[in-house]
C-alpha cells in the first residue's frame, strides 16, 4: 500500500532540512522550480509507476517554497526593529522561569501588524506574572538569526521564538480580571502545579509536576541525571506515553461508545497538549491519537504510519525549524521504531519456548509475561532510530534502560492516572487529597529509588567519550538494526552474550590505555571554567571541577567512567567560585573520591557547605590546606601550596604543582 501522505511529508521534511542547512533562499527557489517542473512532467506521463516520484517531487517543491517564504510571511516588516530599544506591551503566554539573572517569560509581542512569539528577559523576580497578564516595559529587541549555528538561537528557532526582549527592571504588570479562553490551559497547568506542591511531599511533588504538566523545574539536576542514566527520563518529558494513558482513561470511561469517546477524548487531548506547553512530542502524540479516535467515525481504518506523517507535516507547517528540536527528532525516531519493529520483535520473543508456554497459559502469569515481552519489545524497537540521536545529543547509552522500563513503567502509568485524579480532587477539596497523595508518594519514591539504584551500577550507561566506547555503541546499534530487520535472527542469548563480551573487551582496552605507566594531563571541556585530570598509572587526581553549568562534575565522571575508572584518589579545589568548584558535589556523588583538599576560605559560601555535606554523605575525607602538602605516588607527585593571603576568595585559593618522572 502506497501511503501518499507519508511520501509527501517525508519530502517536505527533506526540503525543510535542506533549506535549514543551506539557508539560501535563492537556491531554494531555483530548486523548487526544478522539482515542480519535474513533478509536472511526471504527471503528464501518467505512468502509475511514477506516482510515488510525482508525490515526492511535489513535496520537495512545496516544502522549499514554504520555507523560503515562511519568515517573510510571518515576520513581515517586524525584522527592521532588530537592535532597537522600544516601549512595548506584551502578553504572557506561560508562567515565567528563573534564570541566573532574573526571569524569562514567554510572551506575545504585537509588532507591525504581526503577533510574534518572543522571550522577555527581566532582571528581577517575576513570580507574580501569570498567563494572560500584560507586561509594559522598555525593551531591546534582538532578532533570532535564522542562519545562526548557536545552540541558543537554534533552540529559539525550533520553538518559534522570533525576538528576545531584554527589559532589565521596572516592568509594569497588569492582571486582567478574566484571562482569555486561549490562556485557560496554561492557567490550569499553573493551578495544578500549585495544588500538587500543596498536597504531595517535597520529594515526590517535582516528579508529579513533570509527569502531569511537563514542568521539570521541581526536579533537581541529580534526579534528572539519574533518570537519564537509568533510561526513564522520557517519563517526565510529555510524550506519547502520557497522551496514551490519558486517552486510556477516557476509553475506560466511555466503553464501546466511539462517538462519545471521540467527543470527550479529542477536546481532552487538545487541552492536555496545550496545558503542557505543546512540546513537539506531545503534539505528535496528540495528532496521532486524535486521528485514531476519528478514523472509525468516518469509516476509515487507522494507519499509524499515515498518522505519524500527518503529525510531522502539521508541525513543520507551523514551524519548519521544529526540525532542530531534539524532542521532535527523538519523538519521531522512537515512534517510527516502535511502529515498524515492535510487533516483529514481540513475535520473535513470543516464539521462545519458555515465553510461549507462559503466554498460552493465560491468567496472571500470562499477563505478566505479555507485559514483560511488550515492554522489552517497545524499549528495544524505540532505540532503533533514537539510539544514535541519544548518543550524539546526550552522550549516553543506557544499558539498564530495558530492565528499568520493565520494572517501572507500570508504576509510572499508575502514578499518572492516580496523580491526575488526586490533583483534580485537590482543586475541589484540598483536605481530602492529602491521604491519597501520601499513599501515592510511596510509589513515586519506588520509581525514583529504582532510577537511583540502577544508575549507580557499574556500566549502567556507556559514554562514547573514546574510540573503544564509540566502537561498541556502533556495534550495539548494528545488532539492534540486524535483529529488527533481518528475517533470520540469531538466538537472543547468543546476541546478548556477544555484545557483553565485546563490551568487556572495549572496557579492558580503554582501561589499559588510560592506566598505562606514563603521565597524562587532560583539560576537560567544561565551558567557562576549569577541570583538570592528572593520571599516572592507577593514581588519579582531579584539580578543580567547575564550569559555566552544573554539568562539569557529570562531564568529569563520564570521562573517567568511559575508561573504566570509578575512583579518584584526590580532588583538589583551588577556591570556591562556581567556575572552579561548581561541579564538585556531583563528581563526589558519581565517583568514589578518597580525599578532597579544600582551602579554608574567608567568606561564608553555600557552595562550600554543599561540597562538605556531599563529602560527609559519601564518606570522603576532607582536608583543609593550611600548610603546604606533598602527595607522592609511584612515578610522580603533587605539591599542594597553602593560600598566601586571606583577602578574598581568589587570594585565599590554593595552588598545585604536578610532577612526573
Locations of the language-model features?
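Hydrophobic alpha-helical transmembrane segments of integral membrane proteins
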Residues: 391-437
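N-terminal leader/targeting segments
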Residues: 1-79, 284
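Hydrophobic alpha-helical segments
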Residues: 1-22, 295, 421-453
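Hydrophobic alpha-helical transmembrane segments in multi-pass membrane proteins
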Residues: 37-38, 54-55, 165, 220-402, ...
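Non-globular, low-confidence helical/coil segments that flank catalytic cores
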Residues: 88, 108-114, 121-138, 151-155, ...
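Membrane-helix interface and helix-disruption motif detector
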Residues: 19-29, 398, 461-467
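Membrane-interface helix/helix-cap signal primarily in integral membrane proteins
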Residues: 61-234, 554-561, 567, 601-603, ...
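Residue-level signal for inorganic ion chemistry
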Residues: 15, 90, 327, 386, ...
Amino acid at each position: 500500500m502506497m501511503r501518499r501522505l507519508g511520501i509527501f511529508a517525508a519530502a517536505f521534511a527533506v526540503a525543510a532540512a535542506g533549506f535549514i542547512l543551506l539557508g539560501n533562499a535563492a537556491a531554494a527557489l531555483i530548486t523548487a522550480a526544478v522539482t515542480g517542473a519535474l513533478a509536472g512532467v511526471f504527471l503528464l506521463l501518467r505512468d502509475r509507476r511514477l506516482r510515488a516520484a510525482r508525490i515526492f517531487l511535489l513535496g520537495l517543491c512545496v516544502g522549499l517554497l514554504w520555507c523560503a517564504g515562511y519568515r517573510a510571511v510571518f515576520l513581515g516588516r517586524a525584522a527592521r526593529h532588530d537592535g532597537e530599544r522600544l516601549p512595548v506591551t506584551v502578553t504572557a503566554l506561560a508562567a515565567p522561569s528563573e534564570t541566573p539573572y532574573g526571569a524569562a517569560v514567554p510572551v506575545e509581542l504585537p509588532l507591525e501588524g504581526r503577533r510574534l512569539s518572543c522571550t522577555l528577559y527581566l532582571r528581577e523576580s517575576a513570580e507574580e506574572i501569570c498567563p494572560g497578564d500584560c507586561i509594559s516595559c522598555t525593551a531591546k529587541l534582538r532578532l533570532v538569526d535564522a542562519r545562526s549555528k548557536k545552540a541558543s538561537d537554534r533552540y529559539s528557532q525550533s520553538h518559534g521564538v522570533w525576538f528576545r526582549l531584554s527589559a532589565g527592571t521596572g516592568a509594569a504588570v497588569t492582571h486582567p480580571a478574566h484571562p482569555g479562553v486561549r490562556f485557560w490551559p496554561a492557567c490550569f497547568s499553573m493551578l495544578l502545579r500549585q495544588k500538587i506542591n500543596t498536597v504531595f511531599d517535597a520529594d515526590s511533588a517535582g516528579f508529579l509536576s513533570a509527569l502531569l504538566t511537563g514542568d521539570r523545574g521541581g526536579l533537581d539536576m541529580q534526579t534528572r541525571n539519574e533518570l537519564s542514566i537509568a533510561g526513564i527520563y522520557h517519563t517526565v518529558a510529555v510524550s506519547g506515553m502520557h497522551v496514551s494513558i490519558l486517552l486510556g482513561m477516557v476509553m475506560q470511561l466511555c466503553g464501546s461508545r466511539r462517538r462519545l469517546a471521540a467527543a470527550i477524548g479529542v477536546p481532552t487531548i487538545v487541552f492536555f497538549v496545550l496545558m503542557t506547553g505543546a512540546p513537539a512530542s506531545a503534539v505528535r502524540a496528540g495528532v496521532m491519537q486524535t486521528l485514531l479516535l476519528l478514523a472509525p467515525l468516518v469509516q476509515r481504518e487507522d494507519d499509524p504510519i499515515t498518522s505519524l506523517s500527518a503529525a510531522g507535516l502539521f508541525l513543520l507547517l507551523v514551524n519548519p525549524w521544529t526540525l532542530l528540536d531534539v524532542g521532535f527528532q527523538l519523538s519521531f525516531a522512537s515512534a517510527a521504531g516502535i511502529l515498524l519493529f515492535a510487533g516483529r520483535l514481540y513475535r520473535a520473543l513470543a516464539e521462545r519456548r519458555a515465553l510461549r508456554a507462559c503466554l498460552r497459559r493465560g491468567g496472571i502469569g500470562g499477563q505478566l509475561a505479555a507485559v514483560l515481552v511488550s515492554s522489552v519489545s517497545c524499549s528495544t524497537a524505540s532505540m532503533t532510530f533514537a539510539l544514535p540521536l541519544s548518543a550524539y545529543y546526550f552522550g549516553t547509552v543506557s544499558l539498564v534502560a530495558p530492565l528499568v522500563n520493565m520494572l517501572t513503567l507500570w508504576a509510572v502509568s499508575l502514578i499518572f492516572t492516580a496523580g491526575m485524579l488526586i490533583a483534580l480532587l485537590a482543586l475541589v477539596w484540598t483536605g481530602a487529597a492529602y491521604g491519597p497523595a501520601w499513599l501515592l508518594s510511596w510509589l513515586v519514591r519506588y520509581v525514583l529509588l529504582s532510577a537511583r539504584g540502577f544508575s549507580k551500577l557499574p556500566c549502567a550507561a556507556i559514554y562514547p567519550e573514546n574510540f573503544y566506547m564509540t566502537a561498541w555503541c556502533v556495534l550495539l546499534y548494528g545488532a539492534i538494526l540486524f535483529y529488527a530487520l533481518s528475517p533470520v535472527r540469531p538466538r537472543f542469548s547468543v546476541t546478548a552474550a556477544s555484545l557483553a563480551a565485546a563490551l568487556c573487551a572495549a572496557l579492558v582496552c580503554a582501561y589499559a590505555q588510560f592506566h598505562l605507566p606514563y603521565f597524562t594531563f587532560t583539560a576537560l571541556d567544561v565551558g567557562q571554567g576549569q577541570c583538570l585530570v592528572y593520571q599516572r598509572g592507577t593514581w588519579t587526581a582531579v584539580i578543580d571541577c567547575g564550569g559555566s553549568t552544573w554539568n562539569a562534575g557529570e562531564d568529569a565522571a563520564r570521562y573517567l567512567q568511559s575508561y573504566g575508572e570509578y575512583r579518584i584518589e584526590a580532588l583538589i579545589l583551588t577556591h570556591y567560585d562556581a567556575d572552579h568548584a561548581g561541579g564538585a558535589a556531583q563528581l563526589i556523588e558519581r565517583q568514589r573520591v578518597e580525599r578532597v583538599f579544600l582551602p579554608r576560605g574567608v567568606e561564608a559560601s553555600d557552595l562550600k557547605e554543599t561540597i562538605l555535606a556531599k563529602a560527609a554523605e559519601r564518606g570522603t575525607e576532607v582536608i583543609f590546606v593550611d600548610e603546604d602538602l606533598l602527595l607522592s605516588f609511584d612515578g610522580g607527585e603533587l605539591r599542594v601550596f597553602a593560600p598566601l593571603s586571606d583577602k578574598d576568595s581568589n587570594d585565599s585559593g590554593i595552588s598545585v604543582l604536578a610532577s612526573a618522572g
